[in-house]
Regions:
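An N-terminally biased module of ancient metal coordination in phosphate/nucleic-acid-related enzymes
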Residues: 1-87
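Active-site neighborhood of phospho(di)ester-bond hydrolases with catalytic His/Asp-centered motifs
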Residues: 5-6, 37-41, 72-75, 144-146, ...
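Short, flexible loop segments at the rims of nucleotide/cofactor-binding pockets, characterized by
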Residues: 12-17, 119-122, 179-185
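Extended substrate/RNA-proximal surfaces in nucleic-acid metabolism proteins
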Residues: 49-180
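Aromatic/His-enriched, Gly/Pro-containing loop or helix-boundary segments
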Residues: 188
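Short, intrinsically disordered, charge-balanced linker/junction segments flanking boundaries
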Residues: 191-197
Length: 197
């Protein structure tokens, strides 16, 4: 069994510690028994430079520190748009297979807005379009709806979300292979929704 945390942030995201760096992420992951970490915020220009300086890439999709601790390329993107007469605010975790794909994702996002002001950038892109465009870059990219029950910024959020995965991702639903249930729910709550089976 691998214990992984695939949704983290670097020090350039709002409301994060300035002490967040690769060394501290590794240190505290080991203390907590986490075997694999996401890099967080790979779209942020300063953070991706720290990732490149502190992690070594190989052909497996896993990057490693000098001591061999594994990371996977990961970021979170906030999508804010209107659909069916309602404002939608959906956060998605994105996993990338390598640094070349990260650069292509970043290049695409730069055509839609800024990436330098926050580790979790915001774009006015509907979720189906977002998934479709990322799949044009690489079929190995994973888009994972983040903290799906959070009221304001999630797939099932009561204030700005949807009633089903299909309502949100439409024809791209088949490419959603995982959901992050987040801290706003527990397994018993999630088991009550059959579409999560």
């Amino acid at each position: 069994m691998i214990i992984a945390d695939l949704h983290i942030h670097g020090r350039y995201s709002q409301a994060t510690s300035k002490a967040l760096d690769i060394a501290n992420l590794e240190k505290y992951a080991k203390i907590k028994g986490v075997d694999l970490l996401g890099t967080g915020d790979f779209t942020h220009p300063k953070w991706i430079e720290e990732i490149k300086q502190n992690l070594t890439e190989n052909s497996t999709g896993i990057l490693r520190t000098k001591t061999g601790f594994p990371f996977i390329l990961q970021t979170e993107i906030s999508l804010i748009y209107s659909q069916d007469g309602k404002g939608r605010r959906i956060h998605n975790v994105v996993l990338a297979p390598d640094l070349e794909v990260v650069q292509q994702i970043t290049d695409y996002l730069l055509t839609k807005g800024r990436i330098d002001y926050d580790g979790r950038p915001i774009f006015k892109i509907p979720c189906p379009e977002f998934v479709s465009e990322l799949r044009k870059i690489s079929k190995k990219i994973e888009v994972i709806p983040a903290h799906i029950w959070t009221p304001w910024f999630s797939l099932f959020g009561s204030m700005s979300g949807f009633d089903s995965i299909k309502d949100c991702f439409q024809d791209q639903t088949k490419h959603i292979n995982a959901l992050e249930t987040g801290l706003s729910s527990d397994p018993a709550m999630n088991w009550r929704l059959s579409q999560l089976d």
